[in-house]
Amino acid sequence: MEYLGNTELLNVPKTAFLASSTIQPDMVLKCYDWATQMAKERQCVVSGFSSHLESEVLHFLAKGKQPIILVLAREMYKQIPAELQPLLDDNRLLIISVSKAVRQSKATARSRNKYICEMADKILFVGVTEKSSLYQLKEEFKEKSIKYE
């Protein structure tokens, strides 16, 4: 495991955001509202930010002031994406790499998502059905699961 950024974020309460790759359109705006609310409340959000919706939520969170933990299912960035550099500079981002793989795979994503669930105090699962790769985690960590209406 490799860390870059503010490791003190490991000690604060964290809410995980995990979204299926297939989302109903009505859920998208709700997730944007949720991200805006988390930013206003300065709640730490942890995610892989790899699905389309997760990456969109990261854009909303990046505009706020709350801490963010980004967990990669691949090796650490060789070059930090431009959007993330100001967050590192402001000491409100922690990037964690949980794999030495060059690219994310289904296996490394599963491992990353489980790690996120284990570290989070609460988890918002979005668009998860029985066919979703996140379904097993949603069942395993249902005591941490929250809803956003």
Model-identified regions with their sequence ranges:
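Glycine-biased, small-residue-rich flexible motifs in mid-sequence functional cores and linkers
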Residues: 1-149
